[in-house]
Amino acid sequence: MDIDPYKEFGATVELLSFLPSDFFPSVRDLLDTAAALYREALESPEHCSPHHTALRQAILCWVELMTLATWVGNNLEDPASRDLVVNYVNTNMGLKIRQLLWFHISCLTFGRETVLEYLVSFGVWIGTPPAYRPPNAPILSTLPETTVVRRRGRSPRRRTPSPRRRRSQSPRRRRSQSRESQC
């Protein structure tokens, strides 16, 4: 089966794959963040949101995986085999859990639309040749709160300039004047 855990949230595994693996905090840090911000909702018997449910499931999977890894570590005699299992879990499964935890915590913190806009922005940024892109990648916390992901299709109707604005005053000139007055 080809199951994409992000599909119902408007994202894809491919979209998250644009973010480098070292972008995601450690599982421990993500679990601490989830507990600090959302413990009450995660432990509540009430259904809060699909993101809370997905976060609960990811946390439970990680706990079970750590239980299995501990059992394997205690019962595998061969140190080389033990190291292979530990490395596999940390590298492959750990990354998937880190991505899941990050995605759902970010959606709860910033809003799903903002996170999707960030993923698209980062994907465009990383896909642009270095000579043609800004030196710094987009940062999730600095995206405007009113970010909207536009659906493909008709372009929005263009607005005509307000008749009250005099054309001789350019926005740049006004901004620079206001900066000088603030200093």
From Swiss-Prot:
List of residues that carry Phosphoserine: S155, S162, S170
A single GO BP: symbiont entry into host cell
Gene3D superfamilies recorded: Viral capsid, core domain supefamily, Hepatitis B virus (1.10.4090.10)
Region (RNA binding): 177-183
Compartments it resides in: Virion; Host cytoplasm
Keywords associated with the record: Capsid protein, Cytoplasmic inwards viral transport, DNA-binding, Host cytoplasm, Host-virus interaction, Microtubular inwards viral transport, Phosphoprotein, Repeat, RNA-binding, T=4 icosahedral capsid protein, Viral penetration into host nucleus, Virion, Virus entry into host cell
Main location: virion
Positions of region (Disordered): 136-183
InterPro entries per record: Hepatitis_core, Viral_capsid_core_dom_sf_HBV
Comp. bias intervals (Basic residues): 149-176
Family (UniProt): Belongs to the orthohepadnavirus core antigen family.
Cited HAMAP family: HBV_HBEAG (MF_04076)
Name of the protein this chain belongs to: Capsid protein
Native organism: Hepatitis B virus genotype C subtype adr (isolate Japan/A4/1994)
